[in-house]
Amino acid sequence: MALRFPRFSQGLAQDPTTRRIWFGIATAHDFESHDDITEERLYQNIFASHFGQLAIIFLWTSGNLFHVAWQGNFEAWVQDPLHVRPIAHAIWDPHFGQPAVEAFTRGGAPGPVNIAYSGVYQWWYTIGLRTNEDLYTGALFLLFLSALSLIAGWLHLQPKWKPSVSWFKNAESRLNHHLSGLFGVSSLAWTGHLVHVAIPGSRGEYVRWNNFLDVLPHPQGLGPFFSGQWNLYAQNPDSSSHLFGTSQGSGTAILTLLGGFHPQTQSLWLTDIAHHHLAIAILFLIAGHMYRTNFGIGHSIKDLLEAHIPPGGRLGRGHKGLYDTINNSIHFQLGLALASLGVITSLVAQHMYSLPAYAFIAQDFTTQAALYTHHQYIAGFIMTGAFAHGAIFFIRDYNPEQNEDNVLARMLDHKEAIISHLSWASLFLGFHTLGLYVHNDVMLAFGTPEKQILIEPIFAQWIQSAHGKTSYGFDVLLSSTNGPAFNAGRSIWLPGWLNAVNENSNSLFLTIGPGDFLVHHAIALGLHTTTLILVKGALDARGSKLMPDKKDFGYSFPCDGPGRGGTCDISAWDAFYLAVFWMLNTIGWVTFYWHWKHITLWQGNVSQFNESSTYLMGWLRDYLWLNSSQLINGYNPFGMNSLSVWAWMFLFGHLVWATGFMFLISWRGYWQELIETLAWAHERTPLANLIRWRDKPVALSIVQARLVGLAHFSVGYIFTFAAFLIASTSGKFG
């Protein structure tokens, strides 16, 4: 018999039903469960697949550069970044009629094009690219890196080049390599690029390979570096009248601490950014030399963990046993990596709009909205994944003997206290926030808006004031004009910071009021509830009072029959599944809030947000309905326009989202009956019954149907909001 899919599981390959296909897809990446897997092969497969991942990333970024160089308008955009719309790529569509061709021919293009809302134009411009030739060169270089990554991946699957398990478990060497070799050296290299190419570029000097060695990035060269007069590199920065990309008003400084924003581009000073990367580089280069490898100097991580005895014995045996637990569990390591990456991705979302690093990106409102939303959703998926792999660790890798009375075991020992506290916090936030919103809603409905309960966020305003925002009238720290911190700030450090905080033209420290207070607590409700579900899923993954032997059933099981008092819905996978819905809704509230507050800020009518955001009808009517009006007007006498594609996507997103409920609400029995009826009809229909199937059709399992439903819900949700976000913002601001 020929080898059937899946080859990695002979048991599944012999399954006579369509379960073979779906379970095969579901377990394709669960290398641990494959036939003939060894620890060594597991590590080697994952390692080699990383190179494949890198190849895909390099190919994708190469494609971005190539298509903009080929079909975009980068050179025209560089001449006038505020008024030329950046083109992502051309649209070739034989179905376009004349009205559609006209609607999508924008940005000075000869035919229909897509506008770029990703910020790549601003990024490439800021780092010194100026011509299409530059873009083509970058695309070719990344293509070369992509090929190199593929070769490296193939090479590390060859017997001679396969690393051993001991190599993968050498934590100190890996840490040193990642800290110094990847973070440290790449940050230093990036500082070099900024100082040698980007900063001269921002001052009208075009540095390329042909003149790279002739152009001094600083008039005094390396003299100040070797003589210890490093402050000379900060003298004579660009003036506030500097025109970006020209020598007009430019200075000679390369490493500064100006603070605030470049007045024309509304982005951080490039010389501040270079200084930041240099500091990061030095920090990580030092950090990467702290752990003991072949040279016998530095710390052993195991010794560090074993030596740490918590004060007063309140954490039992502290970190004893943790080193081997973490080092021998890929799921634990992946959980830690995903948790870190998730937090970083969310921080990227927050910082890209509040402290924009790329020239002119702050004035491209649609791009700002798209990037914020994109990074917050990505962060949500990554963070839920962290808890999923944490739960798998507890089921597959956790050894109670090895971790007796250490911090990990003690988390499990007092899990009831953790879960009940999270539950209490979620209930408190939910009832109080909803109570305030509903009360205010009723007051508005009865025509007595003055009876709303409006709470000023005084603690948050006090924190903003401490950082220098003066409009609230708190005389504290940096907003206290006669304090030492304020006076030092004017001269020594970040003189531009206080101006930036108090300017209303940027998104730094937005003025907040009762509407912000309410939505902040709604978001806190979502965050705490999502965390509750995820933490409970991981801490109960090994077992609970209801089902003490849960770990023997694996990560995802539907239930253990009707005889145990209801064991459905309690697998660790079910917790992940439920948490994703909460995560999506929470980030929905986050992005609604961000988007509405910024739309009113950009349009100059902040009072609309302030007045309408304190009650539910305000959100539904003045944010969702008002801003989706262009997307739901259907056919009109004006015909096609450039928002039509988003209107279609808005509808299509709703369709995909709604399809999810078909899988989520009706389960296996209904579909099995339906399938058997359809199979009966098929076998008795002339012509149709000439087509046979090798696998007997059966319904999806409960867990699989939930996954398919969840995927539709997530994808539909994000498609719908993406279309709404981009159309409502670009429709207003172009």
UniProtKB/Swiss-Prot annotation:
Chlorophyll a B1 binds at H654. It is an enzyme of class 1 (oxidoreductase). InterPro entries: PSI_PsaA/B, PSI_PsaA/B_CS, PSI_PsaA/B_sf, PSI_PsaB. Its main location: plastid. It is found in: Plastid, Chloroplast thylakoid membrane. It is a multi-pass membrane protein. It holds the Pfam family PsaA_PsaB. Keywords: 4Fe-4S, Chlorophyll, Chloroplast, Chromophore, Electron transport, Iron, Iron-sulfur, Magnesium, Membrane, Metal-binding, Oxidoreductase, Photosynthesis, Photosystem I, Plastid, Thylakoid, Transmembrane, Transmembrane helix, Transport. The chain crosses the membrane at residues 46-69, 135-158, 175-199, 273-291, 330-353, 369-395, 417-439, 517-535, 575-596, 643-665, 707-727. One of its GO terms (biological process) is photosynthesis. Chlorophyll a B3 binds at M662, Y670. [4Fe-4S] cluster binds at C559, C568. It comes from the Eukaryota. Phylloquinone binds at W671. Its EC number is 1.97.1.12. GO terms for molecular function: 4 iron, 4 sulfur cluster binding; chlorophyll binding; electron transfer activity; magnesium ion binding; oxidoreductase activity. The keyword Iron applies. PsaA and PsaB bind P700, the primary electron donor of photosystem I (PSI), as well as the electron acceptors A0, A1 and FX. PSI is a plastocyanin-ferredoxin oxidoreductase, converting photonic excitation into a charge separation, which transfers an electron from the donor P700 chlorophyll pair to the spectroscopically characterized acceptors A0, A1, FX, FA and FB in turn. Oxidized P700 is reduced on the lumenal side of the thylakoid membrane by plastocyanin. Belongs to the PsaA/PsaB family. This is Photosystem I P700 chlorophyll a apoprotein A2.
